[in-house]
């Protein structure tokens, strides 16, 4: 089982929540924490997770999850409601940077994702979730690549595929309709020709009868 699957099962499933995405991160600038506050737990892995509740009305949240060295379990740390997210900074709109910042109402963190592609995927999911579940105040996405906001997004590609399929089906139906229309015109012409032939034959028959 992957780390993200384990996080979803251990952290979110018991609370009837569904994890939409996660990104493994490290701080770009380490916070100065007193030794006693760390509890001597040593090194750890950090994940930023995005989840939603299964119950309506749906609530979305961002959670910081940690896995300490030597442990197979995960620990829920800080959590923010999606409404508290104010700004998402992609750092570099022109390149594949793994760095990003998250600004909340009461917190600001500077992160580096494990890979630029993992960050990109998480950003796409985060942007889509904000558009779907936030109606009033949406966070600002700055210094982000265009593929995160639209065009090449993995979330939009599926919609584009569906749209393309619908357009092709519509075109096929239109072409079929045109063919049927032409067939109906030919049928009508044949019908008129048959009527004219019948009338001519009737006139000839009457003429010879006379």
Swiss-Prot record:
CDD domains per UniProt: PH-STXBP6, R-SNARE_STXBP6
A Pfam short name: Synaptobrevin
Major localization class: cytoplasm
Membrane topology: Peripheral membrane protein
BP GO annotations: negative regulation of exocytosis; regulation of SNARE complex assembly; SNARE complex assembly
v-SNARE coiled-coil homology domain location: 151-210
Tissue expression profile of the protein: Detected at low levels in brain, and at very low levels in heart, adrenal gland, testis, liver and kidney.
Subcellular location, record wording: Cytoplasm; Membrane
In-chain residues carrying the UniProt-annotated modification N-acetylserine: 2
InterPro entries: Sec3-PIP2_bind (IPR028258), STXBP6_PH (IPR037821), STXBP6_SNARE (IPR037822), V_SNARE_CC (IPR042855)
One GO CC term, this protein: adherens junction
Family annotation (SMART domains): Sec3-PIP2_bind
Keywords tagged on the record: Acetylation, Coiled coil, Cytoplasm, Membrane
PROSITE patterns registered for this protein in UniProt: V_SNARE (PS50892)
Any one GO molecular-function label of the UniProt entry: cadherin binding involved in cell-cell adhesion
Source organism, top-level taxon: Eukaryota
SS bond list: none
Subunit and partners: Part of a ternary complex containing SNAP25 and STX1A that can be dissociated by NAPA and NSF. Interacts with STX4A.
Function: Forms non-fusogenic complexes with SNAP25 and STX1A and may thereby modulate the formation of functional SNARE complexes and exocytosis.
Protein name per the record: Syntaxin-binding protein 6
Native source organism of the sequence: Homo sapiens (Human)
Gene of this entry: STXBP6
């Amino acid at each position: 089982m992957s780390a993200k699957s384990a996080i979803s099962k251990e952290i979110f499933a018991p609370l009837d929540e569904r994890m939409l995405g996660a990104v493994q991160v490290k701080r770009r600038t380490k916070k100065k924490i007193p030794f006693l506050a760390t509890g001597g737990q040593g090194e750890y892995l950090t994940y930023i997770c995005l989840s939603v509740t299964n119950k309506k009305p749906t609530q979305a949240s961002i959670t910081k999850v940690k896995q300490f060295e030597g442990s197979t379990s995960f620990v829920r740390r800080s959590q923010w409601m999606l409404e508290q997210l104010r700004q998402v900074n992609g750092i570099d709109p022109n390149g594949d940077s793994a760095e990003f910042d998250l600004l909340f109402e009461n917190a600001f963190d500077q992160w580096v994702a494990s890979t630029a592609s993992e960050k990109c995927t998480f950003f796409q999911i985060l942007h889509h979730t904000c558009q779907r579940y936030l109606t009033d105040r949406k966070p600002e996405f700055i210094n982000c690549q265009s593929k995160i906001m639209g065009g090449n997004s993995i979330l939009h590609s599926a919609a584009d595929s569906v749209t393309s399929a619908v357009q092709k089906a519509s075109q096929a139906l239109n072409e079929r309709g045109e063919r049927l229309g032409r067939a109906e015109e030919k049928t009508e012409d044949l019908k008129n020709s048959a009527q004219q032939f019948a009338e001519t034959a009737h006139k000839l028959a009457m003429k010879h009868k006379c």
